[in-house]
Amino acid sequence: MSEPAQEYRLVLVTGPSGAGRTTAVNALEDMGYEVIDNLPLSFVPRLIEGPAIGPPIALGLDVRNRDFNATALIELIDGLTQDARVQLEVLYVDCSASELIRRYSQTRRRHPLAPAETPAEGVEREIDLLAPVRARADHLIDTSEMSPHDLKAELARWFDRGAATRLAVSVQSFSYKRGVPRGVDMIFDCRFLRNPYWVESLRALDGRDAAVEDYIRSDPRFAPFLEKLRELVLFLLPAQLEEGKAHLSIGFGCTGGQHRSVAVAEILGKALAEAGWPVSKRHRELERRAAAVLPTHQGEKA
């Protein structure tokens, strides 16, 4: 009986110029990844030809790539995700527009998308260009208030394969109307909880607001649900770690992805962090709304 084929472990690293992508790929190289920077997108499929041997690969991609465009990158991500031989993670190194402009002004560098214009014009253009890619990221790290040392430490939490005693957990909220996120290991449906949307004073808020959380907690079904959820997840995490898993993604869905799923993701994330597990949080629909309203949006820390 033949053994199952080994998986390629591939991390795609992207994000706006000046956010820290180069620092990120250098940090991954220090962790033992084979780093390939600015490879043309059309060449990437060649990386997974033949047997999967050697260290995991970190592939740096940005707007300076010769054939870069967001649509092509998303198509590449879709293709790699569907390939059973590939274990893919997409890392988006983000930064607020104001901080990117400050960094460009401080270093007096020209922006690659606007070499003859102001840094602000290049930054705005690049954030708009990369918005669809940002929405597809598995890991989102906002470096707006990070030093290079802080970024390296955060990356080590998620990607240091030598840290066999760690299991990184991500919790994310989403709207069922927009589909289930890819790459989620466990999904919990929060639509049975009382919906704050129907309370006029809560409609414009989201699950991170105390008033919304209090309303959801007032549902008599919430407390037993949270107790059982916390007990289940804390039971499963050590078992997942024993199986060699480095990352576990937990999704929470509701109708609009604004109130119930966000609140539950926040509450469970806090409970897991208090129990000692590295946790990151993402709220997909809130990120999409922020990107649509304000093109030069500030990145949300994962």
UniProtKB/Swiss-Prot annotation:
Keywords: ATP-binding, GTP-binding, Nucleotide-binding. ATP binds at G15, P16, S17, G18, A19, G20, R21, T22. SUPFAM superfamilies: P-loop containing nucleoside triphosphate hydrolases (SSF52540). GTP binds at D62, V63, R64, N65. The keyword GTP-binding applies. Pfam families: PapZ_C (PF22740), RapZ-like_N (PF03668). InterPro entries: P-loop_NTPase, RapZ-like, RapZ-like_N, RapZ_C. GO terms for molecular function: ATP binding; GTP binding. The keyword GTP-binding applies. PANTHER family: RNASE ADAPTER PROTEIN RAPZ. Belongs to the RapZ-like family. Displays ATPase and GTPase activities. This is Nucleotide-binding protein Rsph17025_2562. It comes from Cereibacter sphaeroides (strain ATCC 17025 / ATH 2.4.3) (Rhodobacter sphaeroides).
